[in-house]
Amino acid sequence: MQLCGFDVGLDQRFFLIAGTCSIEGLEMSLDVAGQLKEACAPLGIPLIYKGSFDKANRSSGTSKRGVGLDAGLKILDEVRRQLQLPILTDVHDTSHVAEVASVVDVLQTPAFLCRQTDFIRAVAQSGKPVNIKKGQFLAPWDMKNVIDKARAAAREVGLSEDRFLACERGVSFGYNNLVADMTSLAEMRNSGAPVVFDVTHSVQKPGGLGAVSGGARDMVPVLARAGVAVGVAGLFMETHPKPAEAWSDGPNAVPLKHMRALLETLVALDDVTKKNGFLENNFGA
């Protein structure tokens, strides 16, 4: 699959979707995107910068939502213009799809909306690649139905079917907790879509701090290493210069100062995993 001008697949180095959870202004976005670009370039990691203009799924009605649609798209467009990076953001409503798709390079769907047929059809027919997140309630093999739904919608309007990513972001495990099942990453390959592992949301504790979500950011490197060892096409990791001050999802964000070291480790693992191939493909014979 071609994505933003680079090849995606298990025969390629993983690509990275990274940025702050919420867009926190132009200066912050340019700073974070610039540092990520400096970290990824020498390692040969294709980078897609992400940021959310609206955090529609919040634990509390008083939680900060974000800079809004118009301001958010302007900031992302400026990041792309100044740093020559492809950009991604999430959409939460069919009414936003066309406007967002006119600006960004990749759309992303919230995990909770993966079974909403009209929504999936709308993003699939936007003309842009889509990172489709698996719901926390969904079995990994059921993502094939979601991807098939998106492909059918794309076919209806004459668009390529080869523009969808299947993203794992953890599964609910009791109250206020998620776990990441590494076998899901392999199971989701059967969807026929490149698999992305959302590491930072997989360590989230939804609503775990009462009015806000908690997280275990110290487990991000652990799960990231495990996911790369399984073999994935891409990684998704949110980051922040000062996670404790982040507008949202600070408890599970990678401290920006540690991103380069983490990526160096992951590249080494990725090389070993993909060089040696995937023996599991032969175990059914």
Swiss-Prot record:
Gene Ontology biological process: keto-3-deoxy-D-manno-octulosonic acid biosynthetic process
A GO CC annotation given for this chain: cytoplasm
Protein name: 2-dehydro-3-deoxyphosphooctonate aldolase
Keyword Ion transport attached: no
Location in or out of the cell: Cytoplasm
EC number annotated for this UniProt entry: 2.5.1.55
Record field: transmembrane: none
Catalysed transformations (reactions): D-arabinose 5-phosphate + phosphoenolpyruvate + H2O = 3-deoxy-alpha-D-manno-2-octulosonate-8-phosphate + phosphate
The protein's annotated pathway: Carbohydrate biosynthesis; 3-deoxy-D-manno-octulosonate biosynthesis; 3-deoxy-D-manno-octulosonate from D-ribulose 5-phosphate: step 2/3; Bacterial outer membrane biogenesis; lipopolysaccharide biosynthesis
Highest taxon listed in the record's lineage: Bacteria
GO molecular function, a single term: 3-deoxy-8-phosphooctulonate synthase activity
HAMAP family, alphabetized: KDO8P_synth (MF_00056)
UniProt family annotation: Belongs to the KdsA family.
Keywords tagged on the record: Cytoplasm, Lipopolysaccharide biosynthesis, Transferase
Keyword Ribonucleoprotein set for record: no
